[in-house]
Structure formats: structure tokens, C-alpha cells
């Protein structure tokens, strides 16, 4: 199914080009803009990417972290202006594109080994 050229042109102008290369298993720090009343601040959400889905303007990724012993997952649109920047802190070595199995693991079992580059 072909995309309407007008829609393609509009979405092309909305795509961000400052996104680092990351995939499932990588640890990232997402600097999200939070609006509280009239104030705006940056909130850092640090965790492991457990999935990426979609393509183009509708692409999203989900980051999982453990906060006070409770697993917290947050899904971000990849090309949203609400995310100030994405930092990749380490690249994980995994064999899956979706890491849902991490939800059942706790402590050291939930660690992901680092991927060696080179």
C-alpha cells in the first residue's frame, strides 16, 4: 500500500536526525521534558531498551528500569520533541528483538552482558 505523497512529505519534515544507534538490550538515558503547570523540566529515565517497534514517524521504544524494587516500563515515541536527547550508556549482547523475558527475572539474573565492538 503506497503512502500519500503529501503525508510522506509532512512526516519527513517531522523526523529527527539526532537519534543515536541503539537496539534492544542497550542501556540508555532518556532526557524527557516534563511540563508541570507553567514550569518545564528535564527528567532522566535510565534503563534497558526491551523493545523497538514501528517505522518512520510512528516508531516507538520501551525502556525498563527497576525503581525501589519495582519494575517500571515507559514507552517513548522515537521522533517526539518531548524527548530532549537519548544517551546510550552501554550496548548489551542479546539474541532477541523483544526482551519480555526480563520481566520475570530479578537481581543478577536480569543482567545483560556487554557487547564487544570490533
Curated annotation (Swiss-Prot):
UniProt keyword list: Ribonucleoprotein, Ribosomal protein
One Pfam family linked to the record: Ribosomal_L19
GO MF annotation list: structural constituent of ribosome
Transmembrane portions of the chain: none
Record flagged with keyword Ribonucleoprotein: yes
Cross-referenced Gene3D superfamilies: 2.30.30.790
Source organism superkingdom: Bacteria
Keyword match Membrane: no
Cross-referenced InterPro entries: Ribosomal_bL19 (IPR001857), Ribosomal_bL19_CS (IPR018257), Ribosomal_bL19_sf (IPR038657), Translation_prot_SH3-like_sf (IPR008991)
GO biological process: translation
Entry GO CC: cytosolic large ribosomal subunit
Alphabetized NCBIfam families for the sequence: rplS_bact
Function text: This protein is located at the 30S-50S ribosomal subunit interface and may play a role in the structure and function of the aminoacyl-tRNA binding site.
Family: Belongs to the bacterial ribosomal protein bL19 family.
PANTHER family cross-referenced by the UniProt entry: LARGE RIBOSOMAL SUBUNIT PROTEIN BL19M, RIBOSOMAL PROTEIN L19
Name listed for the protein in its UniProt record: Large ribosomal subunit protein bL19
Provenance organism: Ligilactobacillus salivarius (strain UCC118) (Lactobacillus salivarius)
Biological classification of the source: Bacteria, Bacillati, Bacillota, Bacilli, Lactobacillales
Originating gene: rplS
